Every structure is written in structure tokens, then in C-alpha cells.
Amino acid sequence: MDKKLKSKSKFLSLVLRHQPELIQLPLDANGWADIEVLLAGAARQGVNISLQDVLEIVATNDKQRFALSGDKRRIRASQGHSIDVDLQLTPVTPPDELYHGSATRFTDAILATGLQPGQRRHVHLSADVETAHKVGSRHGKPVIFRIDAKALTLAGHAFYLSANQVWLTDAVPPQYLSLLDTSPQG
């Protein structure tokens, strides 16, 4: 994604996940927004984004952060909201292990208190080590945590799989996670 589209994608994340009021954008209970209303609100705030930009961002975003309605007239963020929306997620059984990437500077706090959603609605988890490593690398030197999703499920925690294949749960207490050794062998 080129630099201009990346900036526009960040704008979409901001208004669809966190601050729709910045452009007076009404979201329905499930997080959907009318694209024409979004474009008009963006223009009022001096943000130059077109329908073609929106369609290209949705089509080319490797993380599939956004979804379009069947008629392509509405858009929503797939997950990562700090505002209260119902993404209509159904609990699903996760794989036995999931992973979470973070920066090494957060290791002690995570081991002490577990994973909390912070400003988001859910903790975000990855199905594979590679994805978790990429996530952790965005925040500094990465560290990977292995999550005992099977034990968490047996303890009554619900898991959801977002439209863009990110695993979501309410929290991960410290007894259900461990540091994954990613040092080179040999």
C-alpha cells in the first residue's frame, strides 16, 4: 500500500474503530457506517479520500482491517474497536494454542497481570508464531507469548474469530500464558 493510501487507511481506522464523532459519523450497533456519509464527513474535515480510495484500501489491506457490506454501501472495521459495537461474533472453539506478540519492555507486566484489552474491547491473538512476531515487531524488540487456549476455554473464557482471522477473547490471566523461546538453536 502506498504512503497516501496508508495514511487514509489510518484515518479509516480512527473513525471506524475509535472516534466516529470526529467527522459526525453515525455507526449502527454493529459498527457499520454509510460510505457516502463517511466521505462527506471526511471532506468537511479537510480529509481527501474518495470512494475509489476506500474500495482500494479494503481490497488491498493485507490485514483485512475493514469489511464492506454486500451492497458495498457500508463499511466497518473488522475488529480493534475502543467504542462499544456488536460485531455479531459467535463463540468458536480455538486451536489448543494461540500466540500474542508484544515488545520485550512489556514482558514483566504481562507475566504478572496477563493480557488485558486496554482501550480495545478484546485481547488480540494470532493463530501462528509468524503473525505474532510481526505484531510484536511493530512495538519494539518482539517477544512471543504462547496462550493455552484449550485451558482458557475449559475455564469458561469465550473466543471469537474476527472476519480478518484475528482471535479475540476478553482477557488472558497470567497462568494461561508462557514465554515462547524464539532464540536461534545451535
Swiss-Prot record:
GO biological process, one term: tRNA splicing, via endonucleolytic cleavage and ligation
Entry keyword annotation includes Ion transport: no
Record flagged with keyword Hydrolase: no
Keyword line: NAD, Transferase
SUPFAM superfamilies membership: ADP-ribosylation
Enzyme Commission numbers on file: 2.7.1.-
GO molecular function: NAD+ poly-ADP-ribosyltransferase activity; tRNA 2'-phosphotransferase activity
Database matches in HAMAP family: KptA (MF_00299)
Family listed: Belongs to the KptA/TPT1 family.
Function: Removes the 2'-phosphate from RNA via an intermediate in which the phosphate is ADP-ribosylated by NAD followed by a presumed transesterification to release the RNA and generate ADP-ribose 1''-2''-cyclic phosphate (APPR>P). May function as an ADP-ribosylase.
Protein name, per record: Probable RNA 2'-phosphotransferase
Underlying gene: kptA
